[in-house]
Amino acid sequence: MTAKVRIAVVGASGRMGRTLIESAKQQQVIILGAAIERTGSSLIGIDAGVLAGVGAMNVAITDSLDKVVNDFDVLIDFTSPESSIIHLDWCAKNHKAIVIGTTGFNHAQKEQINAYSEQVPVVLAPNMSVGVNVMWKLLALATEVMGDYTDIEIIEAHHRHKKDAPSGTALKMGEIIAQTLGRDLEQCAVFGREGITGERDPNTIGFATVRAGDIVGEHTAMFADIGERLEITHKASSRMTFANGAMRAAFWLSDQNAGLYDMQQVLGLN
């Protein structure tokens, strides 16, 4: 497929929204077709490119997907779990593909996403960075070799504004490790430790969370044994890596049938 794909960005004025708009302007196969903000926003009518600091793109910010239904092919959503479900419902009714980078979905919301994906193409990924997705492959390999005799801990750090913890990326890391070991993450995860906790259970996967400053995103999986320790780490220095991944996902998704996909499939890693 060589035709350009038109995207829409919801939450256009947010940190990620502005980065997505900036990324879209840099792409050869992506066109920004629409940018959406909440009803009543003072930004309605402003050029999306001007808002993002990249110059005019001739796309005025609007407050309704209905107003721009014919202006895009794929919606990109990095908002909140509740908003993402609303946008997904709209996409299903209007036959639009959607790329979801939102994290923090509960079990019921994940079930809703599964159901909607029977109607439209959906990419759901807790992290759209190419590097993170390669890291997940490395985690599976390390777990196969070392997972049954090492203590496994996952440490993640993000900026002070992040609302969910642990991050979706950290949880995905835990899921990959647990699945490789034949365990259920819900049964073996330990989220933080305090007080007299006793000796470490060797079958657990520990999680530690940091929220501070403007950290874009850092994730480390530690495989610790007596005498040596392997650490697999990814550090993001800019949100642009997530935005560029979302553009890649949108282009790929525009040519897919209804279904639920992830970045491993987008990148051909699975």
From Swiss-Prot:
Reactions accelerated catalytically: (S)-2,3,4,5-tetrahydrodipicolinate + NAD(+) + H2O = (2S,4S)-4-hydroxy-2,3,4,5-tetrahydrodipicolinate + NADH + H(+); (S)-2,3,4,5-tetrahydrodipicolinate + NADP(+) + H2O = (2S,4S)-4-hydroxy-2,3,4,5-tetrahydrodipicolinate + NADPH + H(+)
Where mainly located? cytoplasm
Against Gene3D superfamilies, the record matches this protein to:
Dihydrodipicolinate Reductase, domain 2, NAD(P)-binding Rossmann-like Domain
Q: What pathway is this protein a component of? A: Amino-acid biosynthesis; L-lysine biosynthesis via DAP pathway; (S)-tetrahydrodipicolinate from L-aspartate: step 4/4
Q: Which GO MF terms are attached to this record?
A: 4-hydroxy-tetrahydrodipicolinate reductase; NAD binding; NADP binding; oxidoreductase activity, acting on CH or CH2 groups, NAD or NADP as acceptor
Gene Ontology process terms (BP): diaminopimelate biosynthetic process; lysine biosynthetic process via diaminopimelate
Q: Where in the cell is it found?
A: Cytoplasm
Q: What class of enzyme is it?
A: oxidoreductase
Q: Is the keyword NADP in the record? A: yes
Q: In the UniProt entry, which residues are flagged as the active site? A: H158 (proton donor/acceptor), K162 (proton donor)
Q: Name one GO cellular component term.
A: cytosol
The residues that hold (S)-2,3,4,5-tetrahydrodipicolinate are H159, G168, T169
Keyword terms of this UniProt record = Amino-acid biosynthesis, Cytoplasm, Diaminopimelate biosynthesis, Lysine biosynthesis, NAD, NADP, Oxidoreductase
Which positions bind NAD(+)? G11, A12, S13, G14, R15, M16, E37, G101, T102, T103, A125, P126, N127, M128
Which residues of the sequence carry a binding annotation for NADP(+)?
Answer: R38
Q: Which domain of life is it from?
A: Bacteria
The EC designation for this entry is 1.17.1.8
| Protein family | Belongs to the DapB family.
Explain the purpose of this protein: Catalyzes the conversion of 4-hydroxy-tetrahydrodipicolinate (HTPA) to tetrahydrodipicolinate.
**In its UniProt entry, what is this protein called?**
4-hydroxy-tetrahydrodipicolinate reductase
Q: Which organism is it from?
A: Shewanella frigidimarina (strain NCIMB 400)
- What is the name of the gene encoding this protein? dapB
